[in-house]
Amino acid sequence: MIINIGLSGATGKMGRTILERIDNFKNCKISAKFNSTRDLHELNDLCKNSDVVIDFSTPEILEKLVDSALKYDTKLVIGTTGFTSSQFKLLEKAAKTLPILYSANMSIGANLLGYLAKEATKILDDYDIEILEAHHRAKKDAPSGTAIMLAEMVTAEKELDITFNRGNKTRRTNEIGISSLRGGNVHGTHEIFFLGDDETITLKHEALNKNSFADGAIRAAIWLQDKQTGLYSMLDFYKNLINYHLKKPI
């Protein structure tokens, strides 16, 4: 059975990469495309002709996309970043009716980085934790959605406040800071620093191109087909793979 995948944000960088990579997956095809220059009512056609929609567009279309997905019972894989808290609540509400996967980063490397950071946080309890992220000069949101995702994975293990800008204030003991760099054509680099009095441990992920993000999104769309309603993350998708390898003898 061929899975019909709708693509929202088809003319953007991620959309174009997905169109280039889709032929590597034999059990799915792009059935419909939408870009932000078109009428939002065309999202109805996108969802009507798709089993699942992959969205890499802009936060402004989320409400209409969710309405259309609910109307046609279309699953959603959301990779757009920069949502407000009210937009996240909209996703949570829709996920009571539809299977929805949201992630700020679809690559296995970035999600493995988050997993390793969670484990390190359990062990390095008295270390300060900081995140540094770098992206290309045209990226609109800062800090990146991936950096926020990583910080939230850390704070799920240790109660810390996330801060983006200390200004002239000294570091508090109960916080994790995120710093952002913008320039060049950087696809995405994220470093998590565990800073102790006598040593520093650094975990790093660097994307060399957008292929891993695109492949992850397509795999997530396939994986979501037999899932119950709920709001999923890429860690839900990857955790079986991670757990399998962790059980192997070293």
Swiss-Prot record:
<feature type="active site" description="Proton donor/acceptor">
    <location>
        <position position="135"/>
    </location>
</feature>
<feature type="binding site">
    <location>
        <begin position="145"/>
        <end position="146"/>
    </location>
    <ligand>
        <name>(S)-2,3,4,5-tetrahydrodipicolinate</name>
    </ligand>
</feature>
<keyword id="KW-0560">Oxidoreductase</keyword>
<dbReference type="Pfam" id="PF01113">
    <property type="entry name" value="DapB_N"/>
</dbReference>
<dbReference type="Pfam" id="PF05173">
    <property type="entry name" value="DapB_C"/>
</dbReference>
<dbReference type="GO" id="GO:0005829">
    <property type="term" value="C:cytosol"/>
</dbReference>
<dbReference type="GO" id="GO:0016726">
    <property type="term" value="F:oxidoreductase activity, acting on CH or CH2 groups, NAD or NADP as acceptor"/>
</dbReference>
<dbReference type="InterPro" id="IPR022664">
    <property type="entry name" value="DapB_N_CS"/>
</dbReference>
<keyword id="KW-0457">Lysine biosynthesis</keyword>
<dbReference type="InterPro" id="IPR036291">
    <property type="entry name" value="NAD(P)-bd_dom_sf"/>
</dbReference>
<comment type="pathway">
    <text>Amino-acid biosynthesis; L-lysine biosynthesis via DAP pathway; (S)-tetrahydrodipicolinate from L-aspartate: step 4/4.</text>
</comment>
<dbReference type="GO" id="GO:0019877">
    <property type="term" value="P:diaminopimelate biosynthetic process"/>
</dbReference>
<dbReference type="GO" id="GO:0051287">
    <property type="term" value="F:NAD binding"/>
</dbReference>
<feature type="binding site">
    <location>
        <begin position="103"/>
        <end position="106"/>
    </location>
    <ligand>
        <name>NAD(+)</name>
    </ligand>
</feature>
<keyword id="KW-0520">NAD</keyword>
<dbReference type="InterPro" id="IPR022663">
    <property type="entry name" value="DapB_C"/>
</dbReference>
<feature type="binding site">
    <location>
        <begin position="9"/>
        <end position="14"/>
    </location>
    <ligand>
        <name>NAD(+)</name>
    </ligand>
</feature>
<comment type="function">
    <text>Catalyzes the conversion of 4-hydroxy-tetrahydrodipicolinate (HTPA) to tetrahydrodipicolinate.</text>
</comment>
<feature type="binding site">
    <location>
        <begin position="79"/>
        <end position="81"/>
    </location>
    <ligand>
        <name>NAD(+)</name>
    </ligand>
</feature>
<keyword id="KW-0963">Cytoplasm</keyword>
<comment type="similarity">
    <text>Belongs to the DapB family.</text>
</comment>
<dbReference type="GO" id="GO:0050661">
    <property type="term" value="F:NADP binding"/>
</dbReference>
<dbReference type="GO" id="GO:0009089">
    <property type="term" value="P:lysine biosynthetic process via diaminopimelate"/>
</dbReference>
<feature type="binding site">
    <location>
        <position position="136"/>
    </location>
    <ligand>
        <name>(S)-2,3,4,5-tetrahydrodipicolinate</name>
    </ligand>
</feature>
<keyword id="KW-0028">Amino-acid biosynthesis</keyword>
<dbReference type="InterPro" id="IPR023940">
    <property type="entry name" value="DHDPR_bac"/>
</dbReference>
<keyword id="KW-0521">NADP</keyword>
<keyword id="KW-0220">Diaminopimelate biosynthesis</keyword>
<protein>
    <recommendedName>
        <fullName>4-hydroxy-tetrahydrodipicolinate reductase</fullName>
        <ecNumber>1.17.1.8</ecNumber>
    </recommendedName>
</protein>
<dbReference type="GO" id="GO:0008839">
    <property type="term" value="F:4-hydroxy-tetrahydrodipicolinate reductase"/>
</dbReference>
<dbReference type="InterPro" id="IPR000846">
    <property type="entry name" value="DapB_N"/>
</dbReference>
<feature type="active site" description="Proton donor">
    <location>
        <position position="139"/>
    </location>
</feature>
